[in-house]
Amino acid sequence: AVVARLACFADGLDLGLEAAGFEVLGCIEHDQVARRSLKLNRDDWRIIDPPDITAVAEVLQPSDLGLKPSELTLLCGAPPCQPYSKAAMWARNAWAGFDDDRAKPLLSYLKLVETFLPRFVLMENLPCFVTGPRSVAQRVADEFDSINERTRSNYVVSSAILDAADFGVPQRRRRAIVVAIRDGLDMVWPEPTHAHAPVRAWDALHAVGQEDVPSPVG
């Protein structure tokens, strides 16, 4: 199973994808510090240029990653979260939501969906991405409906708000997860495994041990 990644940052999500059996073919990342980190730690990855998803979406084709149309298993990314944050709500102009210029990469993300037609699409963002007065959930669903009409695909979009602590991560981290499946199937969301017995941060840190601490490089 192969995946193309958008907005990798420090590749935390990719560790989970790799543990689930995915191979990362290429990634797009705008932040220069994150790009340097990826090149140092992921020298087998293709770091796609230019580092701008809007520009890349206009030119990138499946063949550039050695794929045929519809051959990509998963297109995965996290569109900019600032337009859907509580900080944006408290700002002078309040929530701009999809009208915020920082939300525009989402359209480029969806353009890449139409270009690659992956079997699965995964997006992660703040809870207000799919709930509240500035939610873009309906806009995203409408865009997938348009993709279906133009490409004769059958994407079905599902969303949920999940807390990482409910699945064994020693941190309360609620995030909106959006999944689209090309085969016309609804997402079956996993049942929480640690909802009543969360892992404590001390337990996780204590288990590391001094011998597992990596040596600094660079």
Predicted features and spans:
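Short, glycine/acidic-enriched loop or turn micro-motifs at the edges of active sites
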Residues: Q32, A55, C81, P127-C128
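Glycine-rich, histidine-containing beta strand-loop boundary motifs that form or position
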Residues: I28, P79, E124-N125
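SAM cofactor-binding core of SAM-dependent methyltransferases
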Residues: A4-A55
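N-terminal Rossmann-like NAD(P) cofactor-binding module of classical short-chain dehydrogenase/reductase
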Residues: A4, L74-C76, L122
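Short, structured active-site "lid" loops
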Residues: L40-A78, I181
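Active-site glycine-centered loops adjacent to acidic/histidine catalytic or metal-binding residues
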Residues: F9, A78, L162
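Class I S-adenosyl-L-methionine
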Residues: V59-L72, Y84-G218
